[in-house]
Amino acid sequence: MTRYLTLHSIEEAKSIINESLKKLKNEVEEVDLFNAIGRVLAEDVFSNIDIPPYDRAKMDGYAVKAEDTYEADEDNPVELKVIGSLKAGEIKDLEINNGECVEIATGAIIPKGANAVVMVEYTERDNDRVKIYRAVPPMENIQFTGSDIMAGELVLRKNTKLTPRDIGVLAAIGKSKVKVYKKLKFGIISTGNEIISPNEQLEFGKIYDINSYTLVSYIKTLGYDFEFFGIAKDDKEELKEKIKKALKCDIILLSGGTSAGVGDLTETAIKELGGKILVHGIKIKPGKPTIIGKIDNKLIVGLPGYPTSCLTIFDVLFGDEKNVVKAKFPVRYISAKGRVEYLPVILVKHKNGFSAYPITKGSGAITSLSEADGYIIIDENKEILENEDVEVHLFGDVKVGLNIIGSHCIGVDIILKEAKLLAKTINVGSLGGVLSIKRGEADIAGIHLLDEKTNTYNIPFLEKYKVKDAVLVRGYIREQGFMFRKELGFKSIEEIIEHIYKLEFINRNKGSGTRILFDKFLKDYNINPKEIKGYNIEAKTHSAVATAIAMKKADIGLGIRTVAEQYNLAFIPLANEHYDFLIRKERFNDEDVQNFIKALKTAKLPFKKPDNCGEIIWGG
């Protein structure tokens, strides 16, 4: 089988999808108003009646002739005769003359002769007489016929997606049924020998089905229906049987099985069922191996198996148009060769607008999208320069809260939980945190930067990078050292040095305090980094380092004791380090920042707290 013989443009793929959707979406059905929420109107809706259909009282009180009240005030009330009462829904032949009034309830019909309502709060009743303590002008507290909606008025337009408020309008004009476009129904099939349902016991080599659940959720937010046909193993006949059952739906979605490799059977199954392949391969990252085909004129789309690729392609092909905001891109970035890249980003709001931080975990990480506020579209073979303007296509509303950008530490999560704060945490390393404070993006940056000359933490770097308008708050002391699996049996730093060129390392990202500490260690012991296996393999968090070691992807790496213990790894200490918090002065007195500092002092942390924890140690 030829692998991606012709890569199609995104526009070509979307054109095929839109052509099919246009035909399907033109089918109309009539539904009960109780079932109309989220549906799309297939016609303009006009009102046949006035709303309200009669003049009615806005308040409880007394229907009066306004001119009878003109002399009334708190010291000189006007006294009127009460000739009757009206409740909402009551119809009585009442007509008031000068010097008379009618007791009236909210929503009741205004009696003949009345042109205003005095609120009950400004009256005093005595049998069939009432004192009025406030004058009212004509039309006061009356809602007149057709003042909300007039007969013949267009109330909702064709193609409106019905909200609860729209349903209320339809009910108000007497519509019990409404014509809407027929709901599209998606048939969903997951594929792969490794895929199991989330309710099953996870065995080695298996992964839980993510794509079915994310696709169903997205489909429902678009107002469509679905039917799940289960998980198909990498067996052609089993896949064909599930596809045949799914053909009762309008559109069939398969996830996985599109990469044209061993066990990727989607294209073969479609062809053997008499179908036609329209697209196999799109110039997009992520999602290159996408398949679009037809069986019996039913659209069938093979989505990539990686969660981010799968959801991104579905969003591009079927999603609603996104709102767009402009932002600065804080780092240099080179896009994929020959493909348009949809790069997920986290938005950080600051005084000059937004900055868009890229999420580069890869298409296999579901958190790439769960953490993202939106994505930027990068043309093929394009380089984005540092601080270049970009357009961010939003998934929804931009999340608000503290912007915490800097070095990863589980202590930050504990503090946020203790303070019950909403925050975005972006792990870019300590130096990245310092620079984000300088750019005005971060509110707080966790840093632990060891200066080789003075052998002290953080303050020398703030002076070196000429940080202004910020304060450094003392945090806590973490124990950094080597994490490794217990069977390796090392007892000392000297033993690690003795075997260092035989071990497979996993390193931290450039600019992180841990990376700086590791490089200093290598320099102090005259160890050549180029001869360290895995020196250039980088992880962005202590947890990622520990995971790689626990899963035997690496033998050893530098991290904090707390994380080593969490992953049941051995630990040999290398240094005690100060993990402090750099905070912008303009945000220092904000309630959220002060609550963060308070929680820093009070939270039970797995680290040593110095006596001046939570106090300003620089820049005050």
Swiss-Prot record:
Q: Which UniProt keywords apply?
A: Molybdenum cofactor biosynthesis
Classification via InterPro entries: MoaB/Mog-like_dom_sf, MoaB/Mog_dom, MoCF_biosynth_CS, MoeA-like, MoeA_C_domain_IV, MoeA_C_domain_IV_sf, MoeA_linker/N, MoeA_linker/N_sf
The answer to whether keyword Nuclease applies is: no
**Xref: PROSITE patterns:** MOCF_BIOSYNTHESIS_2
Q: What are the protein's GO molecular function terms?
A: molybdopterin molybdotransferase activity
Pathway listed: Cofactor biosynthesis; molybdopterin biosynthesis
Family classification = Belongs to the MoeA family.
Among NCBIfam families, the record links this protein to: Glp_gephyrin, molyb_syn, PRK14498.1
Protein name per UniProt: Putative molybdopterin biosynthesis protein MJ0886
Which source organism does the UniProt entry give? Methanocaldococcus jannaschii (strain ATCC 43067 / DSM 2661 / JAL-1 / JCM 10045 / NBRC 100440)
